[in-house]
């Protein structure tokens, strides 16, 4: 940016001229003044920074470095352990020179705002690391090194909090440091010290080395007040001491402080590892709207401070300032970061991007906040670059205002203010929206009075509110109000419950099934009272409250799942919930991502939580009518196959670690039944068959504890089953049924490919080939999955006697009807009853088995809708039957899923639509001379 001399006031022009002249005069006789465009560049820097020109006058050798078109970072100072008296000057000269380079690059437009902030952060880290390294050598000479009980050498860990931790340090910022060390112990030198004293002294000397003002100025202002117990606490704590503090004493504001924490010097790897253990304190496992309480308290304190010191022009702490953007992003991170790892971002701008991606900030607001943040941080840096002052206040002096405005490209101060005002206004609006009291649906005062009077309330207050049994509802509410969970609530939690309860009651009495909504609502509250974050959620998010009651009243299954796994409440808030549901690839990606978690138990819990969340979304979409039940069952099958693939990866990893691998071997998991046919229900078990293959010359695994090859694969299958059925804090993944394997329950758990092929060829019953029609490989090695597909194809393409085939199919259907059909005179078993789903499956399977030898394309699909289309295309089913069969199938699946969602048996009084569906299926069977038993309501069909 060029500044025409005519645009400068006389006073400013004279100031710049004097500053440049002073730098010229400081140049040694032997040093050549840089040529080219250097004078103009120096004038621009002089406009923006007295500090930079003062540094150049003291260190003229820096001029040649800055004359480079793209001046690189300066070399780090080398602190001689033998000359500690020189360290302060060396660090300060380095800091001044490198800071001047940052000014130069910023003013001349060589760096973005982010690059300048990152540069200031690296500078602080380098100074700390150089200083600490020199001090460690000095301490080792005097006191030795600290040795823990296990013999390991201990080092100080320097944690950087705030902007230092986030890599966003402003130009003249202090640095928030916390000192810690991994373990206690004693130093091994002549003047031995206990670890606590050793590291406290080391930390204090580091702070003094950086912070103390000398003739050369200072390196960095150090603030140690964010350590545990503040100024009353120890200067350095062991990791165990830190753990104890945060478990017992940690406060809400400290979660904000430690969100950005990073190990910046000393034993960095140990520090980063410890920060992982602190993560549950910062990011609660569940949705945590209590974070807003801490934010409101901090905001109130800052607002009071701003008013007390008349800091409205403070672009950091004042209205619409940097702090509000940081608090807004951090609060949303704290609320959801425990559930969404992508939100655990130390840096502000990446955090905003992650929040937009996660749907917590919309695209427009995210961009507006990003723009405002960059504007404010650039202005903040320029305010501080002027004189290396830790200021955030807009200047009052006319000359300073002129310099700041011109340096940022504005013709005058008023123009800069005009640009600043809308940025701050937008930030203020967004921040106020976050903390604004939520607009709740107004509940009658009588309900609030009724609730507060419980358990002595008057049941008559519930009369006329749509309840068929107000007395029963009153007793349930009174019992809840008198329960130990409610009586044991803290004052703040009780206040939240008192705000939420009338609204919940009002919504429940207006629900489609109020008599179901009330007990289900109380069951959920009873299960979540110990976690006040859920009360906070309902208090802070009235839309979630209304949505919750609606779901509870309509689905007993979802009510049970919410009570058992309250983390699912997040799904009621997620803005993505009403959008398109994840496709197959997205479901697989969501599950596969957990394989990076080292701990199997933690991985299973995370996998289960993801399965629960996505299953819940599918259920909501079904309940709301946003998608057909057939599509929901397909998505549930995709989700299950993704889970099985992930579990196989975990199981295989454990097996290889323990026993090595069977070289050249392969393993596959075959999905039968509703999983294979991609028609899985909520809570359905998985019908699985395990196959393996290996070269004949390889008879064992290659690990330190080898296993015979067949036994290795059997162990792998057992481990897969154990992991799928393992109980975690989020329940178990799936129940498994392996009875469809060759020879059923009396056979080995796993089958070799050769034995499976032989069984299907020589010994399998017709009903087993029927089951094979819907079977598909859902996980495992591609080579074996392909081999299974070939066995399936070969088996099903066998030429069959049609009459014998139909007889076998009819007999098996009759046997199943006798054993499994629960229909009675007034109700139909949707799955096993006459004209039900299994009848349709048997018709389609008979068609495939009878025709596949001539029409092998029938074997390319295995799900009911695709099989209907395939059999119509080869004219086995009438050409005009496709639409009616699809509708019949969809009607029965929808009715069955509706029963499951409300925890009713799939045994219903047939509606006209159900009867029509049954008639369609019966006619399809009759056309193919498959006369299945009709059951007790034959006349209706």
From Swiss-Prot:
This enzyme's EC code(s): 2.7.7.89, 2.7.7.42
One Gene Ontology MF term: [glutamate-ammonia-ligase] adenylyltransferase activity
Region Adenylyl removase, annotated ranges: 1-437
Coiled-coil region: none
Catalytic activity entry: [glutamine synthetase]-O(4)-(5'-adenylyl)-L-tyrosine + phosphate = [glutamine synthetase]-L-tyrosine + ADP; [glutamine synthetase]-L-tyrosine + ATP = [glutamine synthetase]-O(4)-(5'-adenylyl)-L-tyrosine + diphosphate
Claim: Isomerase is one of the keywords in the record: no
Keywords: ATP-binding, Magnesium, Multifunctional enzyme, Nucleotide-binding, Nucleotidyltransferase, Transferase
Transmembrane segments: none
Annotated GO CC locations: cytosol
SUPFAM superfamilies documented for this protein: Nucleotidyltransferase (SSF81301), Nucleotidyltransferase substrate binding subunit/domain (SSF81593)
Co-factor requirement: Mg(2+)
Gene Ontology biological process: regulation of glutamine family amino acid metabolic process
Region of interest (Adenylyl transferase), residue spans: 444-941
Broadest EC class assigned to this enzyme: transferase
Family note: Belongs to the GlnE family.
Name the record gives this protein: Bifunctional glutamine synthetase adenylyltransferase/adenylyl-removing enzyme
Gene from which the chain derives: glnE
């Amino acid at each position: 940016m060029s500044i025409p001399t005519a645009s400068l006031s006389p006073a400013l022009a004279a100031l710049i001229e004097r500053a440049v002249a002073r730098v010229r005069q400081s140049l040694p006789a032997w040093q050549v003044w840089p040529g080219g465009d250097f004078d103009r560049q120096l004038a621009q820097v002089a406009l923006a920074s007295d500090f930079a020109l003062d540094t150049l006058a003291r260190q003229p050798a820096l001029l040649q470095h800055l004359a480079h078109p793209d001046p690189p970072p300066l070399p780090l100072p080398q602190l001689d352990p033998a000359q500690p008296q020189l360290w302060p000057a060396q660090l300060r000269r380095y800091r001044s020179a490198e800071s001047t380079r940052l000014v130069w690059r910023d003013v001349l437009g060589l760096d973005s705002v982010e690059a300048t902030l990152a540069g200031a952060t690296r500078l602080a880290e380098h100074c700390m690391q150089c200083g600490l390294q020199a001090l460690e050598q000095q301490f080792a000479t005097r006191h030795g090194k600290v040795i823990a009980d296990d013999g390991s050498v201990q080092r100080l860990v320097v944690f950087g909090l705030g902007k230092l931790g986030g890599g966003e340090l402003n130009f003249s910022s202090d640095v928030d440091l916390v000192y810690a060390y991994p373990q206690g112990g004693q130093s091994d030198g002549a003047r031995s010290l206990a670890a606590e004293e050793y590291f406290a002294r080391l930390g204090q000397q580091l702070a003094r080395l950086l912070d103390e003002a000398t003739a050369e100025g200072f390196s960095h202002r150090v603030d140690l007040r964010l350590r545990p117990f503040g100024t009353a606490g120890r200067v350095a704590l062991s990791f165990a001491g830190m753990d104890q503090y945060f478990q017992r004493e940690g406060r809400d504001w400290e979660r904000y402080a430690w969100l950005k924490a990073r190990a910046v010097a000393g034993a960095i790897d140990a520090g980063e590892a410890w920060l992982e253990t602190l993560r549950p304190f910062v990011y609660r496992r569940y949705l945590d709207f209590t974070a807003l309480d801490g934010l409101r308290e901090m905001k109130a304190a800052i607002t009071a401070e701003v008013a007390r010191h008349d800091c409205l022009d403070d672009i950091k702490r004042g209205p619409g300032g940097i702090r509000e953007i940081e608090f807004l992003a951090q609060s949303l991170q704290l609320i959801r970061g425990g559930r969404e790892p992508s939100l655990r971002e130390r840096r502000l701008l990446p955090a905003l991007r992650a929040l937009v991606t996660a749907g917590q900030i919309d695209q427009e607001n995210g961009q507006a906040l990003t723009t405002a943040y960059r504007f404010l941080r650039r202005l903040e840096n320029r305010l501080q670059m002027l004189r290396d002052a830790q200021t955030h206040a807009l200047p009052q002096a006319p000359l300073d205002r002129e310099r700041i405005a011109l340096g940022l490209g504005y013709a005058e101060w008023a123009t800069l203010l005009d640009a600043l005002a809308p940025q701050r206004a937008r930030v203020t609006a967004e921040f106020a929206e976050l903390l604004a009291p939520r607009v709740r649906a107004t509940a009658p005062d009588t309900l609030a009075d009724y609730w507060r009077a419980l358990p002595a309330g008057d049941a008559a207050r519930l009369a006329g509110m749509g309840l068929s049994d107000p007395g029963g509802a009153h007793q349930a509410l009174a019992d809840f109000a008198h329960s130990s969970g409610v009586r044991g609530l803290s004052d703040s939690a009780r206040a939240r419950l008192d705000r939420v309860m009338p609204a919940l009651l009002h919504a429940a009495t207006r629900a489609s099934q109020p008599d179901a909504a009330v007990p289900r609502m109380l069951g959920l509250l009873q299960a979540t009272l110990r976690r006040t974050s859920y009360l906070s959620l309902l208090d802070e998010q009235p839309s979630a409250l209304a949505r919750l009651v609606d779901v509870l009243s309509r689905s007993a299954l979802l009510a049970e799942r919410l009570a058992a796994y309250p983390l699912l409440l997040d799904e009621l808030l997620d803005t993505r919930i009403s959008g398109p549901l994840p496709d197959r690839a997205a479901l697989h990606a969501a599950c596969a991502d957990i394989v990076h978690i080292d701990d199997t138990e933690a991985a299973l819990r995370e996998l289960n939580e993801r399965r629960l969340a996505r299953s819940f979304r599918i259920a909501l979409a079904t309940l709301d009518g946003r998608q057909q039940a057939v599509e929901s069952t397909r998505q549930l099958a995709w989700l299950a196959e993704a889970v099985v693939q992930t579990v196989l990866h975990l199981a295989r990893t454990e097996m290889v670690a323990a026993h090595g691998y069977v070289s050249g071997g392969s393993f596959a998991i075959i999905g039968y039944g509703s999983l294979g046919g991609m028609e899985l229900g909520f809570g359905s078990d998985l019908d699985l068959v395990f196959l393996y293959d290996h070269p004949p010359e390889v008879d064992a695994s290659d690990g330190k504890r080898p296993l015979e090859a067949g036994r290795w694969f059997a162990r792998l299958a057992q481990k897969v089953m154990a992991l799928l059925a393992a109980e975690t804090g989020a329940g178990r993944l799936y129940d498994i049924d392996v009875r469809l394997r060759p020879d059923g329950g009396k056979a080995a758990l796993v089958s070799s490919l050769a034995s499976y092929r032989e069984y299907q060829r020589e010994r399998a019953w017709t009903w087993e080939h029927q089951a094979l029609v819907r079977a598909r490989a859902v996980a495992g090695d591609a080579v074996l999955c392909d081999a299974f597909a070939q066995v399936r194809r070969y088996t099903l393409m066998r030429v069959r006697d049609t009459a014998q085939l139909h007889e076998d199919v009819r007999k098996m259907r009759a046997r199943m009807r006798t054993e499994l059909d629960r229909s009675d005179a007034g109700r139909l078993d949707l799955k096993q009853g006459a004209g039900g789903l299994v009848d349709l499956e048997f018709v389609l399977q008979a068609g495939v088995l009878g025709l596949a030898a001539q029409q092998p394309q029938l074997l390319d699909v295995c799900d009911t809708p695709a099989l209907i289309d395939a059999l119509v295309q080869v004219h086995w089913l009438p050409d005009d039957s496709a639409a009616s069969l699809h509708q019949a199938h969809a009607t029965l699946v929808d009715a069955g899923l509706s029963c499951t969602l409300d925890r009713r048996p799939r045994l219903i009084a047939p509606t006209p639509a159900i009867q029509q569906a049954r008639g369609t299926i019966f006619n399809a069977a009759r056309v193919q001379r498959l006369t299945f038993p009709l059951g007790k309501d034959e006349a209706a069909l």
